[in-house]
Amino acid sequence: MHLFHEDHFTYELPNGWCSEGSGENLLIYDPNGNGAMTISFFSIFDMNKSLDEHISIMAKKFVEKNEISLYGPLILCGSKESKLTLYGTGVTSDKWFIKLWVIARYPRIAFATYQSEKKTSEVKKYDAIISRTNFAT
């Protein structure tokens, strides 16, 4: 099912999944699943760094502030012409699994996190959702 959030972000959900959104926040989940994804939306007003540097700094600040232990380095893919995606996985300070994605196409950024008590194959479904997201032009 193809959906729009606030006329500027498109995403697709598997059958039976739910999304709830208002303003600059969106929640996506499988009612019978293990975890949920929250997405917050931002706009860049002053860009004094490249887009990849900008989203890298955002992600690193989030990781530090929330005391997340990453399993490895953050990975950047995509292009600034379509969309850049920075992602990584780790555990929160209370030992929950977390995956984060920062999806960007200037001037918009979507910051998504998925959390569950433990890592399961469900995270692959969230990866698929993220891979099919787009910013409306």
How would you name each of these model-derived features?
Residues 2-57:
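Secretory pathway targeting signatures of secreted, lumenal, and periplasmic proteins
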Residues 12, 32-34, 80, 103-109:
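Short, solvent-exposed coil/turn segments at beta-strand boundaries
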Residues 17, 110-137:
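Surface-exposed amphipathic alpha-helical segments
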Residues 19, 28, 38, 98, ...:
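Short hydrophobic/aromatic-rich beta-strand segments that constitute the beta-sheet cores
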Residues 22-26, 82, 107-108:
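Beta-strand-connecting loop/turn residues
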Residues 30-34, 90-92, 115-117:
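Secondary-structure transition/turn motif
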Residues 58-106:
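Signature of long, low-cysteine stretches enriched in small and polar/charged residues
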